[in-house]
A protein has these predicted regions:
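C-terminal regulatory/oligomerization modules of transcriptional regulators
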Residues: 1-9, 62, 89-92
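N-terminal helix-turn-helix DNA-binding core of bacterial DNA-binding proteins
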Residues: 6-47, 66
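Short amphipathic alpha-helical/adjacent loop interface patches that line ligand
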Residues: 26, 36, 52, 83, ...
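Basic amphipathic alpha-helical segments that dock to polyanions
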Residues: 48-50, 54-55
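Short secondary-structure boundary/capping segments
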Residues: 53, 68-69
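Glycine-centered, phosphate/nucleic-acid-interacting loop/turn motifs that mediate DNA/RNA or nucleotide
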Residues: 59
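Basic, amphipathic "hinge/linker" alpha-helix immediately C-terminal to the N-terminal HTH DNA-binding motif
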Residues: 69, 73-91
């Protein structure tokens, strides 16, 4: 029970942090991970990527593909209006 509660709280905190990061400017998943790590949050790709997908499926995020000179195309995330509204509500 306690471990499930901790897991849910952590996901909620990460979701808030991701919304805040993307609100500043569109972001590539790797940049999001770096920003979270700079804030001393212990995160791994295996947590962030599924969370980004879930948030996109919930209508909080959208993305666009951009060609990369050093590899495959990159997916850049932005907040949707719904994502901006949620972040505003969370900040109140």
């Amino acid at each position: 029970m306690l471990s499930n509660l901790k897991s849910q709280m952590r996901k909620g905190l990460l979701e808030y942090c991701i919304l805040s990061i993307i609100n500043r400017d569109e972001a590539y998943a790797s940049d999001i991970l770096d920003t979270l790590k700079e804030a001393r949050l212990v995160v791994v790709e295996g947590t962030v990527y599924p969370l980004l997908t879930r948030m996109k499926n919930e209508g909080l995020l959208s993305y666009r593909w951009q060609e990369s000179t050093g590899g495959p195309p990159r997916k850049y995330y932005t907040l949707t209006e719904e994502g901006k509204q949620l972040l505003t509500q969370l900040n109140e």
